[in-house]
UniProtKB/Swiss-Prot annotation:
Name of the protein in question: Fibril-forming collagen alpha chain
Subunit structure: Homotetramer.
Chain positions covered by the region annotation Triple-helical region: 13-1023
Subcellular location: Secreted, Extracellular space, Extracellular matrix
Glycosylation sites (chain numbering): K96, K108, K192, K261, K279, K573, K612, K657, K738, K765, K810, K927, K936
Biological role stated in the UniProt entry: Fibril-forming collagen.
GO cellular component: collagen trimer; extracellular matrix; extracellular space
Length: 1027
């Protein structure tokens, strides 16, 4: 049984022998069912308060205070439910729903709120509860609702409702007992809308919250050797949003809110069936037929045949079961609907509005893509985590409950048959004609022709059940939000602007670009590549694509000469690596294709960012040297070759400007690049190593400067060229030696991407190499961001849901169920504490003591004492639910009686079972109403429901049920053609009408027939309470 709060049952003082049932009194007010505590950790089961002497019961032969004097005490209200202990331990099995009255379908209650959104976009809104189907058939006995323990059985009038004995919390239902299948989730048949009066159609449920998206898997860690780590597993899908609680059936007791379908939280407790809906009264009798024309004199009009009584409307379909309740939350059982009074006759019931259709729950949003794996030690980016599993779509809203059928107008009672009309006096004989023929006899007064008896107004057929609410349209699946575009990586391009610093590029000319190939050694700066880890920023590297602007970057290339490498230190830009988070946008990075743009060369590193798109893996594509294309630019690098004038390499200091080539700074991002592990991707840079260019690299020092030279051609850098004079910075070019850091040159490996450029080898080497450093940034970036995603890995938290597995504990409870046997002792329950002793066990047999057994609840401690106490687990004894079955036994009888109501009181006796309840083992006792005998004690768990058997006193409510029953009878009965014929009777007045007399018969008969229906009366529902 899903975890649900248990209702706290107060212990009841020993119950004296049951007195003879008192005369039925008006049904005692049914105690309110204790509110269900919020699910909390199941608190320790507080001692169960002793059950006070049972209050006088309601009509059901009120149980005597102690039963000794036989005076039924007033039925005590059900004690407040203790707060639900944390942990939402499953409540004791709810009372077994009594067979719901065939009432109108309850309106669907509003949908429960959707679960909170989880960190990863927690559960989506619960799917709307579908409208409840058309009025349910006479509800079968509701499955044992997985309601929390029924509120204390007021029947025994909790002695001063023993407050909740220590809040039993959800009876601190041990763990979530595994759903012992507390009677199976059958209880899930949601709350069976008691078919009480047809409630107004509930609003259609709100669309359920879409299930949470699964968290994206964590990115795999890169392998030690730099192999991309395995991608993180996809995050578990977020739990689906809980479906909104099922709407309450109309006036029928509100069903517990169906919890969202959670991990299969307990289903809301079954709402008590509402009182039988009023049977739609027959429609008003048909108009009386106009009196027939006088027939031939003397002929009496034949009495009209009574109109057929309207057939009762078809029984509505059974309401759909409510969706499974949220875990732990059992909906409070709805109060039993009051049986509808018989509608005044003659008024046709309006047809109830059709229930709104539930909306379909939104689709769960797609899980976030897994973060890119962290780069391995070799710097290779780990594989991106798998995208989180897409959250489950919210359930499709259930069909809205059928609009309540309008009560059929009560059938108008047939007016009493009109007095038979005096036969029209025969006209005086006509004067004899001249021929002496007697004048024609005066025509008899026209017999008022009995109009055809007014057809009994068709019994107001119940309106056809209101059409089922159209099935809620499925709400459009919440459109999956398109993944936010990966935020564009902060345009590193801006850095590219730095490229304009490139003007230093002219100095770049200095760098013979070919030497740039040396830049390949710059790959050393590739160490910056380490910065490359900043590369995560590189995710922004996508922006790096803008880095294409980077081409000015090439001016940066000037700087690129290892200068950039220092910039790699600039890796602070790696902070941009933070931008890298935008790299999430990096998904675009998937556009990794863009990474291609990265090919634009420096941006190519951005291309790495494109890798970002890959979420790392793509980053690898970035390695693809999207920069490679940049490599093509590399040919421009060849221009760098022009740079071979590299001697201007002195301008290399301008290369420092190359530093300006913030792109290099991007390299700084590289600093961020710790992620730069990707920088290792730069290994691709190794390709750069391929960098035959590497050899150039030697030239590199100059070349480095020179490389920018290529950009220098852009000439814009030319101005920067002035910085060229900085050529002393060319010394910085030595920094280019830092380029030697080029080990990061591995970054240069990223240059490999450049390698793609290899075709442009000259450029490839040079520019790409340069790009490579940026690439470092880029690649890094991708990982960085994704690494962040790694956070989602948290989703694993859902694992917490695992506790639900705790419910599995219920199974444990099951064993306590056996303890329930001890529950017999539970009967001894008062001693229940002693319950372990079970000494009173024999008394438990006494049953009445069994009530004492309620103390047996204290017996729960007994449960503890006895395994029964374990019975708390016994609560889990939900297995005891089986006990509920027992309950049904107990409740059943009371239930039926429940209709009688008073017998329901006997249901109170059910309490003996209650003792079963007591020992939660006692609850088993319930089963044991037999459990009173204790043996059933196990079932006694169920017995708690047995307490509900006490609730059977609610059977009084059952009495209410009877009214419902009458409703049906009355309704049709009235219709019993009487009314119909009545009108004809009047017509009959013309003597001939007298014949109409026949109508009378039909009238009464009509009535009688309908009563048959009463059988369905919900009172058993009351017994449900009892249950």
């Amino acid at each position: 049984y899903r975890a649900g709060p248990r209702y706290i049952q107060a212990q009841v003082g020993p119950i004296g022998p049951r007195g003879p049932p008192g005369p039925p009194g008006s049904p005692g007010q049914q105690g309110y069912q204790g509110l269900r505590g919020e699910p909390g950790d199941s608190g320790p089961m507080g001692p169960i308060g002793k059950r006070g002497p049972p209050g006088p019961a309601g009509i059901a032969g009120k149980s005597g205070d102690d039963g000794r004097d036989g005076e039924p005490g007033p039925r005590g209200g059900i004690g407040p439910m203790g707060p639900r202990g944390a942990g939402g331990m499953p409540g004791m099995p709810g009372p077994k729903g009594h067979r719901g009255f065939r009432g109108l379908s309850g309106s669907k209650g509003e949908q429960g709120k959707s679960g909170n959104q989880g960190p990863d976009g927690g559960p989506g809104p619960a799917g709307p509860s579908g409208p409840i189907g058309p009025r349910g058939q006479t509800g079968e006995r509701g499955r044992d609702g997985k309601s929390g323990l029924p509120g204390l059985r007021g029947v025994d009038g909790l002695a001063g409702p023993p407050g909740p004995p220590g809040p039993i919390g959800s009876t601190g239902s041990p763990g979530f007992p595994g759903t012992p299948g507390s009677k199976g989730d059958r209880g899930q048949s949601g709350i069976k809308g008691a078919q009480g009066l047809q409630g107004p159609v509930g609003l259609s449920g709100q669309p359920g919250v879409a299930g949470e998206n699964g968290h994206p898997g964590m990115p795999g860690m890169d392998g030690a050797n730099g192999e991309p780590g395995a991608s993180g597993e996809s995050g578990l899908p977020g739990p689906s949003g809980f479906p909104g609680p099922r709407g309450m059936p109309g006036t029928a007791g509100s069903p517990g809110q169906a919890g969202a379908k959670g991990d299969g939280g307990p289903t809301g407790e079954q709402g008590r069936p509402g009182a039988p809906g009023v049977k739609g009264s027959s429609g008003p009798p048909g108009d009386v037929g106009a009196p027939g024309h006088a027939g031939e004199a003397g002929k009496r009009g034949s009495p009209g045949s009574p109109g057929p009584a309207g057939s009762p409307g078809p029984q509505g379909d059974r309401g759909l079961p409510g969706s499974r309740g949220l875990p732990g939350m059992t909906g409070a059982s709805g109060a039993m609907g009051i049986p509808g009074e018989k509608g005044p006759s003659g008024e046709p019931g309006a047809k109830g509005p059709t229930g709104d259709t539930g909306r379909q729950g939104n689709q769960g949003t797609p899980g976030i893509a897994g973060l890119p794996g962290n780069p391995g030690s070799d710097g290779r980016p780990g594989k991106d985590g798998r995208p989180g599993i897409r959250g489950k779509d919210g359930k499709q809203g259930e069909q809205g409950p059928q609009g309540p059928q309008g009560l059929a107008g009560l059938q108008g009672r047939a007016g009493p048959p009109g007095a038979r009309g005096e036969p029209g006096k025969n006209g005086a004989p006509g004067e004899p004609g001249a021929h002496g023929e007697q004048g024609d006899a005066g025509k008899d007064g026209e017999t008022g022709a009995a109009g055809p008896p007014g057809a009994a107004g068709p019994t107001g057929a119940r309106g056809p059940p209101g059409p089922r609410g159209q099935q809620g349209f499925q709400g459009l699946a919440g459109a999956q939000g398109t993944p936010g575009e990966a935020g564009k990586t902060g345009e590193r391009g801006a850095v590219g602007a730095t490229g304009p610093s490139g003007p230093a590029g002219p100095g770049g000319e200095r760098g013979a670009p070919g030497d740039r190939g040396n830049v390949g050694p710059r790959g050393m700066p590739g160490e910056r590549g380490a910065t490359g880890p900043a590369g995560p920023t590189g995710s922004p590297g996508v922006a790096g694509a803008k880095g294409q602007g980077g081409p000015p970057g090439p001016a940066g290339l000037v700087g690129l000469p290892g200068e950039r490498g220092p910039k790699g230190v600039g890796g602070s830009k790696g902070s941009r690596g933070d931008i890298g988070p935008r790299g999430k946008a990096g998904e675009r990075g998937k556009d990794g294709e863009r990474g291609e743009r990265g090919e634009n060369g420096l941006p190519g590193p951005s291309g790495l960012a494109a890798s970002k798109g890959e979420r790392g893996d793509m980053g690898s594509p970035g390695e693809r040297g999207s920069p490679g294309p940049a490599g093509e630019r590399g040919p421009a690098g060849s221009q760098g070759i022009q740079g071979q004038p590299g001697p201007p390499g002195d301008a290399g200091p301008a290369g420092t400007k190359g530093d300006i080539g913030f792109p290099g700074e991007r390299g700084t991002r590289g600093a961020t690049g710790k992620q730069g592990a990707r920088g290792p991707r730069g290994l691709a840079g190794k390709r750069g190593l391929r960098g035959a260019g590497g050899s150039r690299g030697e030239t590199g020092a100059q070349g480095e400067i020179g490389l920018p030279g290529s950009p220098g051609q852009p000439g814009l850098p030319g101005p920067s060229g002035q910085p060229g004079p900085s050529g002393p910075a060319g010394t910085a070019g030595k920094q280019g030696v830092k380029g030697a850091r080029g080990s990061p040159g591995l970054v240069g490996k990223q240059g490999d991407r450049g390698s793609d450029g290899e075709p442009g080898r000259d450029g490839t080497k040079g520019e790409r190499g340069e790009d490579g450093p940026p690439g470092v940034s880029g690649p890094t970036g991708a990982p960085g961001q994704q690494g962040e995603r790694g956070m989602p890995g948290m989703v694993g938290l859902r694992g917490e849901t695992g506790p639900m597995g705790g419910q599995g504990m219920k199974g444990d409870g099951g064993p306590p169920g056996p303890s329930g046997d001890r529950g017999e002792r539970g009967n001894a329950g008062p001693q229940g504490p002693t319950g372990p002793s079970g000494q009173a066990g024999a008394p438990g047999q006494e049953g009445a003591p069994g009530k004492d057994g309620l103390p047996g609840l204290a017996g729960r401690p007994g449960e503890r004492g006895e395994p029964g106490v374990a019975g708390r687990a016994g609560s889990q004894g939900l297995a005891g639910l089986m006990g509920q079955r027992g309950l049904p036994g107990a409740a059943g009888p009371p239930g039926d009686r429940g209709e009688r109501g008073e017998p329901g009181g006997q249901g109170v006796q059910g309490p003996v079972g209650a003792p079963g309840s007591q020992g939660p083992a006692g609850i088993m006792g319930m089963k044991g109403e037999a459990g009173g005998k204790g043996a059933k004690g196990d079932k006694g768990w169920t017995g708690l429901p047995g307490l509900q058997g006490l609730q059977g006193t609610p059977g009084h409510s059952g009495e209410s049920g009877p009214p419902g029953a009458p409703g049906p009878r009355g309704a049709r009965g009235e219709a019993g053609g009487r009314g119909s014929q009545g009108p004809p009777g009047k017509d009959g007045q013309p003597g001939p009408s007298g014949r109409v007399g026949p109508r009378g018969p039909s009238g009464d008969d009509g009535r009688s027939g309908p009563p048959g229906p009463p059988g369905p009366p919900g009172p058993p529902g009351n017994s449900d309470y009892g249950a």
